[in-house]
């Protein structure tokens, strides 16, 4: 199979085995690249392009072609829905890669009817050299084994 894809959901758990109650080995976040190695029941065996983790994910929404222009620069960027930009309960995690489809005042649309605040994103090429500030933003965060969220 070995096709490259990009995650189109906020995040998904990568499981050690192709079953619901399996341990989590890692996570994929929005815009992250992965390859599908094989399919087993309702699961895909995948390998992440960035850190080379492999494991199983349920069938998910993904892009075949994706050219990210920006990334999330805060721990959790709230997702807003529709033209009224209604707050949702979902977030995109830190370093999720997105492509700006549209701009409207202080918001950008990254997916049909899904918006983020402009101040929460930065160009993909921008490097943040203030490591102390980055580290402090992770203080008091709950630890999740294998987690990126």
Tell me the role of every PLM-derived stretch.
Residues 22, 51-54, 114-117:
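Short, surface-exposed beta-strand-loop junctions and turns on beta-sheet-rich folds
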Residues 12, 54, 141-143:
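Flexible, active-site-adjacent loop/turn segments at secondary-structure boundaries
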Residues 9, 116, 138:
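Residue-level signal for pocket-adjacent positions within structured domains
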Residues 95-96, 117, 129-130, 136:
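Glycine- and small hydrophobic-enriched segments that form the cores of compact globular domains
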Residues 1-18, 27-30, 37-40, 47-50, ...:
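SH3-family beta-barrel domains
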Residues 132-149:
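Catalytic cores of peptidoglycan-degrading enzymes
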């Amino acid at each position: 199979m070995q096709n490259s894809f990009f995650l189109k959901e906020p995040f998904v758990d990568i499981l050690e085995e192709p079953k619901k109650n399996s341990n989590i080995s890692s996570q994929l976040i929005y815009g992250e690249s992965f390859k599908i190695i094989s399919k087993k029941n309702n699961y895909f065996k995948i390998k992440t392009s960035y850190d080379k983790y492999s494991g199983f994910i349920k069938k998910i929404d993904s892009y075949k072609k994706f050219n990210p222009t920006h990334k999330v620069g805060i721990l959790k960027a709230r997702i807003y829905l529709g033209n009224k930009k209604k707050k949702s309960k979902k977030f995109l995690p830190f370093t999720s890669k997105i492509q700006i489809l549209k701009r409207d005042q202080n918001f950008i649309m990254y997916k049909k009817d899904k918006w983020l605040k402009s101040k929460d994103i930065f160009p993909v090429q921008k490097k943040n050299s203030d490591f102390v500030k980055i580290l402090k933003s992770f203080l008091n965060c709950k630890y999740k084994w294998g987690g990126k969220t």
